[in-house]
Amino acid sequence: MLGKIVKVVVDRPLGSVHPNHKDIVYTVNYGYVPKIMAGDGEEQDAYILGVDVPLSEFTGKVVAVIHRKNDIEDKWVVAPENLVISKEEILEAVHFQEQYFDIEIEM
């Protein structure tokens, strides 16, 4: 999946609040990749990095996969095709939500 170009439908834009956990504010755009099913039986979730404005959809490259060791699903990290990003930058960007999980980042 790494390196693949995908379209993400953003259902939780930058600055929005988690629908079930009101203390979680999305510091990045977050959504799903239509027609790609994840381990939880829902469409594949994705963080969008490298874009600092709220979006409704985005097409970009899968630059990393966040494996949740203590959960049944992985999260994709999607970014503009030419963006160079480190594991540390990804960890910092997704910490607002991934801090509750034991994760490993594949790049």
Give the location of each predicted region.
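Hydrophobic N-terminal alpha-helices or hydrophobic patches in metabolic proteins across all domains
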Residues: 1-107
